[in-house]
A protein has these predicted regions:
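Nucleic acid-binding interface residues in structured DNA/RNA-binding domains
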Residues: 1-117
Length: 117
């Protein structure tokens, strides 16, 4: 696993249940504002055969419009919607949610600030 992917996974683990963050938000918080696609690639790699990384709540990352992104995996959007709903996030049948209501940006920023001292 690359160091960059490890940073992405560590940050995604900071997103609390019932909250979400955008791909771009994750990228900004790790210091690579233009790497939102890389965040997507890293999260997609979690499902790759032989991947040993566990306990990364990939479903808590959505696009910048508050929508679950389509995936190469047939049922991934439905799985993500169901996992978010199980955490209390209101996700519409159109796979949209309110970033205003569920964003973890400030929470993650505070966790990082405390961690870095």
């Amino acid at each position: 696993m690359s160091e960059l992917y490890a940073e992405i996974y560590a940050l995604v683990k900071l997103i609390p249940k019932g909250r979400v963050m955008s791909y771009g938000g994750v990228a900004r918080h790790i210091g690579h504002a233009n790497y939102s696609r890389v965040v997507g690639y890293a999260l997609n790699a979690l499902g790759a055969p032989g991947n040993k990384v566990k306990n990364v709540p990939w479903w808590r990352v959505v696009n910048s419009q508050g929508r679950i992104s389509n995936s190469s995996t047939f049922d991934a959007a439905d799985r993500q919607r169901d996992l978010l709903r199980a955490e209390g996030v209101e996700v519409g049948d159109d796979y949209r949610l309110s970033l205003r209501n569920y964003s973890a940006e400030v929470i993650v920023y505070e966790k990082l600030r405390k961690k870095l001292g």
